[in-house]
Structures are given as C-alpha cells and as structure tokens.
Amino acid sequence: MATVNQLVRKPRARKVAKSNVPALEACPQKRGVCTRVYTTTPRKPNSALRKVCRVRLTNGFEVTSYIGGEGHNLQEHSVILIRGGRVKDLPGVRYHTVRGALDCSGVKDRKQARSKYGVKRPKA
C-alpha cells in the first residue's frame, strides 16, 4: 500500500482500455474495398462454410469481415461498409459487413429482423 506522500508525488496510473476493433479508430463504421471474398470453416464444435472477405479500409488497415445473411453479391473490388462485432467461432474475424450499404445488397426475401440485413419493408 502506497503512503499518502508517495501518492502525492506520483498518482496511481489509470488502466488503458484496449479496443476490440482497432481498425475502426473510434468510428462507428468504415468504408473499404474487398480484396478477397472466400469461405472459411468455424472452430470446433461448429461446422459450416462461413462467408468472409478481406477488406482494405480507407485508413490503410486490412481486416477480415464477416458477411451475414443468406447469399451475397460481393466480389473483389466491391466497396463495402464495415462495423465492429466479432464472430465467436471464426478466429481473427472482428468486423461485420453492413448489409444494404454501398455495394453490398440486402438479403433477398428477408421478412424478419430486416433492419439487421438492409431490407426495406415489403409492399403489403
């Protein structure tokens, strides 16, 4: 335990919080260009072909972003928007692609949770 005198001379150091999404640089979203679109397999015990893409961001970072929803129209050189949010069973994937923004289309025939997949309200 430090004495009062020691604390007067040198106050306690504050802990610095480390960001989970460093490439966003404290922004809500960032724009980038797909450099590679591919599928990868999740960690045990899950099994699937998860759709992901490598993205070169406007700030120079290159990150891996998950493409949520069923089906997508992304290919190399597509301009997309990414947001934070990791995918628990894909190591190294800390970002999500925003569906329905820029070159990334919304999910076709989506009826529920539409706002998460960039789908407009269907005609009644």
From Swiss-Prot:
GO terms for cellular component: small ribosomal subunit. SUPFAM superfamilies: Nucleic acid-binding proteins. The keyword RNA-binding applies. It comes from the Bacteria. GO terms for molecular function: rRNA binding; structural constituent of ribosome; tRNA binding. The modification N6-acetyllysine is found at K108. One of its GO terms (biological process) is translation. InterPro entries: NA-bd_OB-fold, Ribosomal_uS12, Ribosomal_uS12_bac. Keywords: Acetylation, Methylation, Ribonucleoprotein, Ribosomal protein, RNA-binding, rRNA-binding, tRNA-binding. Part of the 30S ribosomal subunit. Contacts proteins S8 and S17. May interact with IF1 in the 30S initiation complex. HAMAP family: Ribosomal_uS12_B. With S4 and S5 plays an important role in translational accuracy. This is Small ribosomal subunit protein uS12. It comes from Escherichia coli (strain K12 / MC4100 / BW2952).
